[in-house]
Amino acid sequence: MFDFELDRAVAWINDGGFSSVALQLPEGLKVRAAEVSDFLHSSTGAEIIVVGYPCYGACDLFDYKGVADALIHYGHSPIPSMGDDPNVMYVESRSDATVDPSVMDSLASLPQRVGLLATVQYLGLIPSVKGMLEKSGRTALVGKGDRRICHPGQVLGCNCTAAESISDEVDAFLFIGEGDFHPLAAAFGMQKPVLVLNPVTGEVRSMAETRDRILRRRFAAIQRASAANSFLVIQCSKAGQNRSAEADLMVRKLREHGKTAYKVILEEITPMSLMAYRVDAFVNTACPRIAMDDSARYDRPMLTIPEAEIVLGERTWDGYVFDQIRSDR
């Protein structure tokens, strides 16, 4: 179960004197939206407005102004580099799952030096897993990410700097969490094995096959885009995905290499939103996972920034890197 911290939310609404509050949840938690809304309204008297738009992370924070007095954002931690708004409350929805020591039998293949990673919901399990690994004679390290990362060991779909910070000191990474989205960021970004420990099922698996399958698709997209003459550079208007400087630089690079280049600004990047543009290929400067994970949905090559640089000859195929959204500020 995930902790919705309803008592803390009630106290925050009452202390702030908010008469209306927007409620933003990721897709996996929206099944609880009615229950949470009912509880908060009955406990505070505030009008609760559920945000129905898809929510992909704290990078996709809803602009509540003009709709409500405040916002409660569920399922993600703050992105420190985006600044602080006292009228926004983050509820990380931590899991109460535990890891049984018997899981160590499935981790026998781990090398001596291991880096630990997790999504925000399972960060609380890092100390216990670290203790189990150290008891087995291994060294377990937890890295610290850049200013997009709120907690040590945390991985976002667009940022694996917590892994990067300890990469030279470990031989493999163990990710604690569910699904492929977050561990793939580490698998793409690090040239080292990444294993996933699912704390709900106890399953342990490698990301190598999934990573390699997606990378083969990426190289195919790069090859297809090599024949393109016209490109649409996509800039996203979401606050946490808006890389305007990178988009402008990419337009200039394409034109310097004799390509026709245009820039479009979109809130939501979908096949439908790009269908009308008569270009040969797209360069995405928003969340890199749009290109990497969803490329099969688009009828033309969709590239990340480093992939476009390979097409232009500014980067070699051997120099392929994961397009992280970073922040050192």
Region roles according to the model:
Residues 1, 8-22, 227, 317-329:
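Iron-sulfur (Fe-S) cluster-binding modules
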Residues 3-7, 13-207, 212, 216-217:
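The feature marks the mature, well-folded catalytic cores of soluble enzymes
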Residues 25-36, 128, 239-247, 251, ...:
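Cofactor-cradling patches in redox/metallo enzymes
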Residues 52, 144, 265-268, 304-306:
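Short loop/edge segments at beta-strand edges and connector loops
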Residues 70-71, 75-85, 166-184, 225-240, ...:
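Extended, charge-rich low-complexity interaction segments
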Residues 94, 200-212, 288-329:
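Peripheral docking tails and interdomain loops at the edges
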Residues 102, 106, 121-128, 224-229, ...:
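Short, glycine-/small-residue-rich phosphate/pyrophosphate-handling segment
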Residues 181-260, 268-276:
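Redox- and metal-dependent alpha/beta enzyme cores, enriched for Fe-S-associated oxidoreductases
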